[in-house]
Amino acid sequence: MITCFIRYQIDPHKRVEFERYARAWNDAIPRCGADLIGYFAPHEGSATLAYGVYSIESLAAYEAYRARLAVDEQGRENYAFAMRERFILREERTFCEAVDGAPIERPSLPAAA
């Protein structure tokens, strides 16, 4: 299992557009074959750094996933939205694997008070 960390540099004046873009992947990414961990918008510190994180079995599975995403209707619409609105200034992907090889588990969070 590998995890893809997408680092975005976004226009800080178009955070709302980035959030719309991020929410649109909630269905498309899993439908096309990756395990979405989440999208993260700036909160404190830099107003321009955002992240997307998902896991997938291998680089070969990643290539097949990208091909499915390219023909997915919602995926195509979301890519077009990003190109039209130009809120992503830069995007880079890094692929990592867990050091011990174990799958990443999401921690249980305490209930809000």
Tell me the role of every PLM-derived stretch.
Residues K14-R15, F40-H43, A80:
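Intrinsically disordered, low-complexity segments enriched in polar/charged residues with Gly/Pro
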Residues Q9-R20:
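Short, surface-exposed ligand-recognition loops at beta-strand->loop->(often short) alpha-helix junctions
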Residues R20-I37, I56-F95:
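An amphipathic, aromatic/His-enriched active-site/gating alpha helix that lines ligand/cofactor pockets
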Residues P12-K14, S58-A60, V99:
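Residues that cap or initiate secondary-structure elements
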Residues I2-Q9, G38-A70, R93-T94, P107-P110:
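Short, well-ordered beta-strand segments in beta-rich or mixed alpha/beta enzyme
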Residues M1, D72, R84-A113:
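Intrinsic disorder/low-complexity detector
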Residues V16-F18, Y62-A64, P103-E105:
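Short acidic, gly/pro-rich beta-turn/loop elements at beta-sheet edges
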